């Protein structure tokens, strides 16, 4: 672990909608229009361009627009109906409050609200959006270091791959795709689970969170002199997966299989189907296998606690419903699905390639997340 001195400004994509409603609390300046703004507004696209409205006042504007607070210490802004948990089982809308600048751009299919702020201010919210701000001090410190490392690794990587990155491999026999922050072209990271949860300042203002951030300021994880592309999860099911089996096909030696247990937990080779089956049907003594409501309420936000059976779970569908679901989720018409066969498992036992056989088509799909998306209205649990 080392200290990182250059902490950049970030652009975080918050809200994606045909119309964006926001409130500027304080005086904000927009250089595009040369005007000052305060109060409640909405912006939407019309046949003649973009219209910024406040009460009865209508103002044609050109995008992008950036609203910059005159006093960053006392000013903030609110965004209405921010969708969190996008396409996950906890998806919902929240009204959220942010510090820093508000930038609005056009991404063709929708308008996008972007928050521009410092990295450390961003982390102040992230560590209490991903976990509850009442978590123990060491939990908060660890999360601050992990989240800072992940973010800086993405920023450094973007300098080398922008415009050249592909996150899928498709041919007649396989549809292989993975998801990462490279899905975003017009800002650094998004504010949702796709990247890291960043839900504004309302959840972040606790002394413990600020103290954890200050205690670890600038600290990052490194491997052979390079900032680690650190990843985290709330529940690993007893064993973690290798990076290249879940995301892009790049091996990071520091992101390999480990067991989540007080002692080295013997799992066997979980790439083997029979061994994996035995593991999945068991309940090993893992740290994340807890039903202690007091612990869970201390570390998890309310909507995360709605998921009761997160360590082991089961989902079933009638064949006709499953066939329709798969077609709707990935746009591939298998006809009536006759068989689903595991082709490859990762070192944690997770499926990373699955063969779907229908009366119209047979295809292998992967990686882990596209499998979870394909067989669920939202996502299967990981």
List the model feature ranges, each with a label.
Residues 1-382:
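Conserved, single-site charged/polar hotspot
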């Amino acid at each position: 672990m080392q200290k990182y001195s250059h902490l950049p400004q970030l652009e975080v994509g918050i809200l994606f909608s045909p119309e964006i409603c926001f409130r500027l609390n304080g005086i904000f300046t927009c250089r595009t229009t040369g005007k000052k703004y305060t109060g409640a507004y909405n912006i939407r696209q019309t046949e003649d361009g973009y219209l910024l409205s406040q009460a009865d006042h209508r103002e044609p504007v050109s995008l992008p627009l950036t609203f910059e607070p005159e006093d960053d210490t006392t000013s903030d802004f609110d965004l209405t109906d921010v969708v969190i948990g996008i396409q996950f089982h906890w998806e919902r809308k929240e009204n959220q409050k942010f510090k820093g600048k508000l930038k609005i751009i056009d991404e063709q299919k929708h308008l996008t609200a972007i928050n521009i702020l410092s990295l450390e201010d961003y982390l102040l919210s992230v560590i209490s959006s991903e976990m509850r701000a009442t978590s123990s001090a060491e939990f908060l410190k660890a999360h601050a270091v992990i989240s800072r490392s992940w973010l800086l690794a993405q920023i450094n990587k973007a300098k080398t791959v922008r415009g050249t990155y592909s996150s899928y491999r498709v041919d007649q026999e396989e549809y292989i795709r993975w998801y990462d922050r490279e899905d975003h072209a017009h800002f650094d990271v998004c504010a949702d689970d796709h990247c890291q949860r960043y839900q504004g300042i309302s959840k972040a203002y606790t002394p413990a969170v600020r103290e954890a951030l200050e205690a670890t300021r600038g600290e990052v994880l490194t491997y052979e002199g390079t900032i680690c592309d650190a990843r985290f999860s709330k529940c690993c099911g007893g064993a973690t997966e290798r990076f290249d089996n879940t995301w892009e096909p790049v091996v990071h030696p520091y992101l390999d299989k480990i067991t989540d247990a007080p002692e080295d937990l013997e799992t066997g080779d979980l790439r083997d189907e029979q061994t994996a089956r035995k593991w999945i049907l068991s309940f090993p003594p893992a740290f994340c296998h807890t039903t202690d409501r007091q612990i869970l309420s201390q570390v998890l936000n309310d909507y995360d606690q709605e998921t009761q059976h997160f360590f082991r779970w089961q989902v079933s569908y009638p064949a006709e419903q499953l066939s329709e679901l798969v077609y709707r989720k990935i746009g591939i018409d298998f006809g009536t699905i006759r068989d689903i066969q595991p082709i490859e498992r990762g070192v944690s036992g997770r499926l990373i390639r699955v063969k779907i056989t229908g009366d119209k088509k047979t295809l292998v799909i992967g990686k882990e997340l596209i499998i979870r998306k394909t067989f669920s209205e939202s996502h299967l649990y990981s």
